[in-house]
Amino acid sequence: MNPALVTCLQAAPQARTIEDVADWWTLWRSLGPIADGPAARAIAGGFAADRVGWAFASGYQAALRALMPDLSHDTLAAFCVTEAQGNRPRDIRTTITPLADGMLRIDGAKRWTTLGPSSAVLLIVGGLAEASGAGRPTLRVAQVPVPTPGLVLKVMPPTRFVPEVPHAEVLMQDLRVSAGALLPGDGYDRYVKPFRTIEDLHVTLAVLAYLLREARARRWPAVFTEQLVATLVLFSDLATEDAHAPTTHVALAGALHVAHRLYLDAQPLWVAAGDDPAGMRWQRDAALFEVAGTARWQRAQRAWERLGAEPPDGD
């Protein structure tokens, strides 16, 4: 069992109030010495969170480190993919242009960059201008420190759920970085494509760990608490699997159904808490669990097809 999960079963289940992003980030950084690896950090961060928003932020940062192991634990980062048209390869209009002096010029705009307003480094997805022929554009990821000349971050309106977690519009005009800022490998196949799977795994780990702490603190039924633990073990194990593999995607689809059932089972427990602020936040933030549901269903369907099997009927 992941040592971080053992800690969740033994530590006092009270969490301190987290005031803002800076306060959460200080707490998350402090977990590094006691949480070895991205899955452990997702669990530890979720358990320490006083609400779903900070659990989500913890899972998101853990997912980035699972995707990019060289990313410093002490650097708040944001993955900049989505643009005005969406996040598919053909939607990416941001360009990365190699210059004669060996530098790279980045131009474009991103939207809904999670934790963007508070990040110290942005991981920006763009198409190589020299490879703009027919077919899927060649995407790369550039690591850009904040601030950098030519980079402007605009805070976007809060979302209706987890409004504590800020998002940014990222504007790039004649932004220049060294060629060494490019991460190795294809930007889509190595980073964008697997990130949804990795993010689903680590954000769910964090939210389940948050719910486990609340269940212990509120002395909710043992069967519910034990199911949370079992599901955390399941997701912790899945987080070690190949994020590209169809078998991982099929198993993740089933695991997410189990997690969502637990979220539904938690609803009457929160309702019984009355006007408790934590319960009211949970009701508000529950919409987070339905985001990208269609994309997850499509991922599972494609996984079955890649396995040469007919997808099961039903949801």
Language-model features: locations:
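Glycine-rich beta->alpha junctions and the first turn(s) of the following alpha-helix
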Residues: 154-238
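A generic structural signal for well-ordered coil/turn residues at beta-strand boundaries
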Residues: 75, 90, 118-120, 138, ...
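DPxDG-like acidic metal-binding loop motif
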Residues: 107-146
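Alpha-helical interface subdomain recognition
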Residues: 1-41, 201-315
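Residue-level signal for inorganic ion chemistry
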Residues: 64, 142, 211
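Short loop segments at secondary-structure junctions
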Residues: 99-101, 127-131, 146-149, 173-181
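Short helix/loop capping segments that flank catalytic or ligand/cofactor-binding pockets
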Residues: 89, 114-116, 151-153, 179-182
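Glycine-rich flavin
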Residues: 2-114
